[in-house]
């Protein structure tokens, strides 16, 4: 019987002692960069979600290594940020202490599972040698005008004691804004904050998605978040005033259908009118208690209050009423819309409520109609379709200086300050006049302190460290920035850090040597991780990469060529989580069933992108199959000279299917093919040696421990199983020479015959009438007609 605990312990030691997993780039081979989304090293340790994510990357990296690639598959730790700090506060520990302990535990668990990682390439975002370069990138962003301090309304989370980026704020089932981490309430609050101008790269972030092999769904998530819309701004003058309202519209061609102007509740004109109109003040108070979705959903009742001003239509010169509307928001365009009831459902509902004119503007399409059509009642746009009408009206607006073509984005600049302790310090100083000076000596170390509790006032705990905060240089006084960078900073460039890791330090990010390494290894070929990072980590990392490309640090435009989002592991239909008490510890199953069985089960559950239920009976079954594989080698004779025509065909079919499925990440189907092949092998007392060696090569991608043992004990090889090449198959030996076809008597199937491919009708009929089952049906009967479709079916009509 196969003892997985003894075998796995044995091979872990051998691999470590021999430095098998040490990365050495072979420049004669093509490169392949496989990457996992590196984890936050929590106290809970590795969970099944990690195993579901890391196993497919490991399987595929081994496959590419067998195919002759120089493969880099590294691992590291995303250790700064809120999770570590929250845990530190809850346990009254310092985050640095337990982070190191947790990392050691993670590494132990990872090694238990047989993942092929070179720990010499390990990165840790809290390592000063690492965050030196995070700080360097920030300085470059600042020097290039892409980082600045602004007075802005921020997402403030009192419970976490910090500001959050838009991407870190969720809307709960009740419509409340809550933090992604902990689901705590989030409110708007004015503060001075660092922002990074990600919006400068909005078009590149959309356009360059075409350079990637991402799923349409993942691309659309990013496109939707960026929210690009092309339209025009139009200026409506205010009657008897020098003021004007500038609206943004994605349909400027509908301008002749305008019957009102709608303003957001915080538009400057609304706030000005509020002081003179009690109705407006009451309406704004009502809106302040509503959630965004309660204001913008199509089926929500439209409400508004008429302002005591009139706008002048820029073309027709007609007076247009102005309303503050519940469904107009400040975060789109300029917080002002031109209401076109005939061309927008929400505008239509609003116009109906206030008895406003609804002018039909698209021929043969009653209001509201939002699709393409021929314009009517639209002056010089009459007879044009949407595209032509938009082009013509934009030209008119620009020529007459009453508007212009404009691109609008939902994406906002990245709020980059956090009022917490556990993060990268900003490498800047402020002089007594508030001017910013960048640090020359990097890294600027995070000072040690046990007082890490958020102040709750908007200041970081670092503000209490007066000796660190206040700096004297050449008799001048300076003050350090006391905010820290968000947890996303290190993950924006860590995939580059793996390539530059050199002992305990890193090659300079801006060196020629680094550029040459990046030329060889970028982009990352396969990146596997959760879809929850689609508008956080993935968007931020792409932004930083594009900036680094702009300043000639990296040679290419995109960091990650192919991304696969693995599914979740479910228990009773719910995601595994500590709060639900349904977490399954992988280490327990490594002990009880073995790492190979666990890895195989994880890949056999279904497609890696699917969220699938954890079934203990499933890993029990995989444990039995691992034993069955081992027993085959124990009980059968492995012979280099043995051959069997049928087994040879089955072997080549197996290798072909396994190779194709591996290439397409259909790992569950590869395992199915291995099971079928093992079943076939059990029919023989002898098995060909080469077949079994190559079977072990394929199996080793999933089950590295048992295959090393079989390779040594039964196949008598002194080299590692990983020293082999991926097996090849011979198409000629796969070709079928026979086929099974049904034989019908008077249209009913009575037998299935095996015939030679391409057999003539005479040959097939002769074979059929000699068959015992067919004889029983045609005895004492006359065959009046034979119907034969080659290689498909034979039908005998009898009387």
UniProtKB/Swiss-Prot annotation:
Presence of keyword Membrane: no
Principal location: cytoplasm
GO cellular component: cytosol
Residues that bind ATP: 578
Catalytic reaction annotation: tRNA(Leu) + L-leucine + ATP = L-leucyl-tRNA(Leu) + AMP + diphosphate
Subcellular location: Cytoplasm
EC number in record: 6.1.1.4
GO molecular function: aminoacyl-tRNA deacylase activity; ATP binding; leucine-tRNA ligase activity
Residue positions of motif 'KMSKS' region: 575-579
Pfam families: Anticodon_1 (PF08264), tRNA-synt_1 (PF00133), tRNA-synt_1_2 (PF13603)
Similarity-based family: Belongs to the class-I aminoacyl-tRNA synthetase family.
Cited NCBIfam families: leuS_bact (TIGR00396)
Protein name: Leucine--tRNA ligase
UniProt source species: Malacoplasma penetrans (strain HF-2)
Taxonomic lineage of the native organism: Bacteria, Bacillati, Mycoplasmatota, Mycoplasmoidales, Mycoplasmoidaceae
Gene name as annotated: leuS
């Amino acid at each position: 019987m196969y003892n997985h605990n003894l075998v796995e312990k044995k091979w872990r030691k051998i691999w470590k002692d021999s430095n098998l997993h040490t990365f050495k780039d072979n420049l004669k081979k093509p490169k392949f960069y496989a990457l996992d989304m590196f984890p936050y090293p929590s106290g809970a340790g590795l969970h099944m979600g990690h195993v579901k994510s890391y196993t497919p990357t490991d399987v595929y990296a081994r496959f590419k290594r067998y195919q002759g690639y120089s493969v880099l598959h590294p691992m590291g730790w995303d250790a700064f940020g809120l999770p570590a700090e929250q845990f530190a506060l809850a346990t009254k520990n310092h985050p640095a202490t337990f982070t190191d302990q947790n990392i050691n535990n993670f590494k132990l668990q990872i090694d238990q599972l047989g993942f092929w990682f070179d720990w010499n390439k390990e990165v840790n975002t809290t390592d000063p040698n690492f965050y030196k370069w995070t700080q360097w990138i920030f300085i470059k962003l600042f020097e290039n005008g892409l980082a600045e301090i602004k007075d802005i309304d921020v997402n403030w989370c009192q419970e976490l004691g910090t500001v959050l980026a838009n991407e870190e704020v969720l809307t709960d089932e009740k419509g409340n804004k809550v933090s992604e981490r902990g689901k705590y309430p989030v409110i708007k609050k004015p503060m001075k904050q660092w922002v990074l101008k990600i919006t400068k790269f909005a078009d590149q972030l959309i356009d360059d998605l075409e350079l990637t092999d991402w799923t349409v769904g993942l691309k659309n998530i990013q496109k939707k978040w960026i929210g690009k819309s092309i339209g025009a701004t139009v200026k409506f003058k205010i009657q008897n005033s020098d003021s004007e309202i500038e609206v943004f519209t994605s349909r400027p061609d509908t301008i002749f259908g305008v019957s009102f102007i709608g303003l957001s509740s915080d538009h400057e004109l609304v706030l000005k009118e509020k002081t003179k109109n009690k109705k407006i003040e009451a309406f704004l108070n009502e809106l302040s208690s509503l959630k965004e979705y309660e204001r913008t959903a199509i089926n929500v009742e439209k409400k508004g209050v008429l302002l005591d001003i009139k706008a002048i239509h820029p073309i027709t010169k007609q007076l247009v009423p102005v309303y503050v509307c519940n469904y107009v928001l400040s975060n789109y365009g300029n917080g002002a819309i031109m209401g076109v009831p005939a061309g927008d459902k929400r505008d239509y509902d609003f116009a109906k409520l206030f008895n406003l004119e609804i002018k039909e503007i698209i021929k043969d399409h009653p209001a509201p109609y939002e699709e393409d059509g021929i314009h009517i009642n639209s002056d010089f746009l009459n007879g044009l379709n949407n595209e032509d009408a938009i082009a013509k009206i934009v030209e008119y607006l620009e020529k007459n200086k009453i508007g212009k073509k404009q691109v609008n984005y939902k994406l906002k600049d990245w709020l980059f300050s956090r009022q917490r302790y556990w993060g990268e310090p900003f490498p800047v100083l402020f002089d007594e006049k508030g001017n910013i000076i960048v640090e020359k000596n990097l890294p600027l170390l995070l000072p040690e302190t046990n007082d890490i509790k958020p102040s709750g006032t908007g200041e970081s705990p670092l503000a209490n460290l007066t000796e660190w905060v206040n700096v004297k240089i050449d008799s001048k006084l300076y003050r350090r920035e006391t905010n820290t960078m968000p947890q996303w900073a290190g993950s924006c460039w860590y995939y580059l850090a793996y390539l530059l890791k050199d002992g305990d330090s890193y090659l300079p990010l801006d060196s020629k040597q680094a550029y040459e390494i990046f030329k060889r290894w970028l982009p990352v070929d396969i990146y596997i991780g959760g879809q929850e990072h689609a508008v956080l980590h993935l968007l931020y990392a792409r932004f930083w990469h594009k900036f680094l490309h702009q300043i000639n640090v990296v040679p290419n435009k995109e960091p990650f060529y192919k991304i696969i989002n693995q599914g979740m592991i479910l228990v009773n239909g719910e995601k595994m989580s500590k709060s639900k008490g349904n977490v399954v510890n992988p280490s327990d199953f490594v002990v009880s069933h073995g790492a190979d069985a666990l890895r195989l089960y994880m890949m056999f559950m279904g497609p890696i992108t699917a969220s699938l239920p954890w079934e203990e009976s499933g890993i029990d079954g995989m444990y039995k199959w691992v034993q069955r594989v081992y027993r085959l080698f124990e009980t059968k004779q492995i012979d280099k000279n043995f051959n069997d025509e049928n087994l040879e065909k089955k072997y080549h079919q197996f290798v072909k299917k396994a190779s194709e499925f591996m290439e397409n990440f259909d790992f569950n189907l590869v395992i199915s093919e291995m099971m079928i092949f093992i079943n076939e092998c059990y029919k023989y007392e002898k098995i060909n040696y080469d077949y079994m060696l190559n079977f072990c090569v394929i199996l080793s991608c999933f089950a590295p421990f048992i295959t090393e043992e079989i390779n040594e004990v039964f196949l008598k090889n002194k080299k590692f199983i990983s020293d082999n090449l991926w097996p090849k198959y011979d198409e000629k030996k796969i070709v079928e020479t026979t086929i099974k076809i049904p034989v019908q008597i008077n249209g009913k199937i009575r037998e299935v015959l095996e015939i030679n491919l391409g057999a003539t009708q005479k040959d097939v009929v002769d074979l059929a009438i000699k068959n015992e089952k067919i004889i029983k049906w045609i005895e004492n009967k006359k065959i009046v007609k034979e119907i034969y479709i080659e290689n498909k079916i034979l039908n005998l009509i009898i009387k």
